[in-house]
């Protein structure tokens, strides 16, 4: 429960008790206070899509998506749709109203008893049929489709829409895989409209779904040729503009006799301040207006009264996303508490994002800074990140979770301070790279596995990692020259298969081969090496 709601309940309890700490019998409205508070949200909740605040084009796009599944229109371009937007912008409400208006029935998928197909060692999909209530993805999908089809094969008047809500916060891997499997089947079968709802929080699952939920767009290039381009079928729901919200506030004030008074001496606009405090969240906005009415009744609410209310009403925490958080840390130092709050959003990833992107930020945002000064800043930040790495090791090796703020201080706060303390920073928009650390960890394990496998060969038991790197470098050079006989002469005495030689070549990640080996070249090498594979 938000602090605003808690404050409202506190106000209600104070109003219903007199000085003698007894119920106030004279106040006839006390009995209905709870009902009135609840009805504030119900009273101003849109009953049709035309009443929804925000971009009407998004509403039309969702309606057009559902219209594909009517009897008259059999052609379905894309059966899946993904809606993204910040919390509180009305994604779910908008979806529910449009589904109702278009004559569909909303189905919230229950994925608890669904078994997901897995790949065996032979890379063949094996789908286990479980006894009891467990169902396969295909069985579940068929069940959904049968709900919208009559025994004669005609579409039932009450069609269904499957909605996966709040996908960004799903933590169960089984459910994630089930959703992806259902989307994959529906992309092929195109029998059921599926809507995915997610927030703007960084999520690997959501990113994967965006790549799966695609639509074909027909274009004509500059030469007059037709081209089919696949793009993500995503609708980004943005918050209403301030003018719309201002009109909505004025409407509620008229209906509830809430007197917001703007004085000539006020430096700021009270409407604008309320909008900013609501953070463009309409649900939160209604709670704020409700609280002001409960506190001040029919009295005027000036900017001073609102400032006093704002002091005790905490703003909601907004997840800025890892890229926006990285940009804020690198280009705008917000103090210790501000930087730590960004760190708290994604403790593992954001420090790595800072580490990945701070050198390029210094280079591009300080063009007038000398190379020596740039190196000095990099040195300070790298020392701080190095300290954070030591603390990170202590946290996970000794379970010292209380040290996480210290880790955040060295990994985010100090780097943000050092990188923003110098004058004349451009602060231009940048495209940040996703951290390569996770990939490097995976590569390290793969390389260790390859080296251990190669060292099983009696000729390579005592070969060090440096020797393998030299081997990889020499082999790459020879292969790029297409000198296959030289490769065979060097490697034949070791008795290695071509696959093992290719694995050794891949150990060197610094210098990549310009061209991979073709099938004919691999066959030629196998013959020269005297191996089958």
UniProtKB/Swiss-Prot annotation:
One of its GO terms (biological process) is DNA replication. Residues 17-31 have a biased composition (Basic and acidic residues). Residues 1-31 are annotated as: Disordered. Pfam families: RFC1. The keyword Metal-binding does not apply. Disulfide bonds: none annotated. GO terms for molecular function: ATP binding; DNA binding; DNA clamp loader activity. Part of the RFC clamp loader complex which loads the PCNA sliding clamp onto DNA. This is Putative replication factor C large subunit. It comes from Acanthamoeba polyphaga mimivirus.
């Amino acid at each position: 429960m938000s602090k605003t709601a808690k404050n409202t309940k506190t106000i209600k309890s104070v109003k219903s008790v007199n000085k003698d700490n007894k119920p106030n019998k004279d106040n006839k409205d006390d009995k209905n206070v709870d009902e009135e508070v609840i009805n504030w949200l119900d009273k101003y909740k849109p009953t049709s899509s035309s009443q929804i605040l925000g971009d009407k084009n998004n509403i039309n796009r969702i309606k057009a998506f559902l219209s594909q599944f009517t009897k008259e229109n059999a052609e379905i371009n894309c059966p899946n749709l993904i809606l993204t937007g910040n919390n509180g912008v009305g994604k779910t409400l908008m979806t529910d109203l449009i589904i109702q208006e278009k004559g569909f029935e909303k189905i919230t998928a229950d994925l608890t008893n669904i078994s997901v197909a897995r790949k065996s060692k032979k890379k063949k999909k094996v789908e286990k049929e479980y006894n009891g209530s467990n169902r396969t993805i295909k069985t579940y999908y068929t069940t959904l489709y049968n709900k919208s089809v009559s025994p004669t094969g005609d579409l039932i008047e009450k069609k269904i829409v499957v909605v996966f809500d709040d996908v960004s916060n799903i933590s169960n891997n089984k459910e994630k895989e089930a959703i992806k499997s259902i989307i994959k089947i529906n992309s092929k079968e195109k029998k059921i409209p599926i809507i995915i709802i997610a927030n703007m929080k960084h999520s690997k699952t959501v990113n994967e779904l965006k790549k799966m939920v695609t639509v074909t767009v027909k274009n004509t290039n500059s030469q007059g040729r037709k081209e089919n381009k696949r793009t993500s079928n995503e609708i980004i729901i943005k918050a209403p503009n301030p003018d719309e919200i201002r009109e909505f506030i004025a409407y509620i004030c008229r209906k509830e006799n809430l007197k917001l008074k703007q004085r000539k001496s006020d430096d700021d606009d009270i409407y604008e301040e309320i909008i900013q405090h609501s953070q463009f969240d309409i649900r939160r906005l209604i709670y704020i207006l409700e609280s002001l009415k409960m506190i001040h009744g029919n009295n005027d609410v000036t900017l001073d009264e609102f400032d006093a209310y704002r002091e005790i009403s905490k703003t909601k925490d907004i997840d800025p996303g890892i890229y926006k958080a990285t940009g804020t840390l690198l280009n705008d130092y917000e103090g210790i508490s501000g930087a730590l709050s960004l760190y708290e959003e994604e403790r593992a990833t954001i420090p790595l994002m800072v580490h990945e992107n701070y050198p390029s930020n210094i280079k591009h945002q300080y063009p007038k800074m000398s190379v020596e000064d740039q190196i000095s800043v990099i040195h300070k930040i790298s020392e701080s990140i190095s300290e954070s790495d030591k603390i990170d090791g202590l946290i996970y090796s000794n379970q010292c979770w209380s040290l996480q703020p210290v880790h955040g201080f060295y990994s985010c706060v100090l780097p943000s301070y050092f990188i923003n303390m110098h004058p004349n920073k451009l602060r231009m928009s940048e495209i940040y790279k996703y951290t390569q650390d996770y990939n490097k960890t995976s590569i390290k394990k793969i390389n260790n596995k390859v080296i251990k496998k190669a060292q099983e060969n009696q000729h390579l038991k005592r070969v060090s990692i440096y020797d393998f790197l030299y081997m990889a470098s020499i082999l790459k050079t020879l292969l790029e020259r297409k000198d296959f006989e030289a490769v065979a002469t060097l490697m034949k005495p070791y008795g290695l298969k071509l696959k093992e030689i290719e694995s050794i070549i891949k150990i060197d990640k610094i210098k990549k081969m310009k061209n991979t080996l073709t099938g004919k070249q691999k066959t030629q090498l196998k013959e020269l090496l005297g191996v089958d594979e």
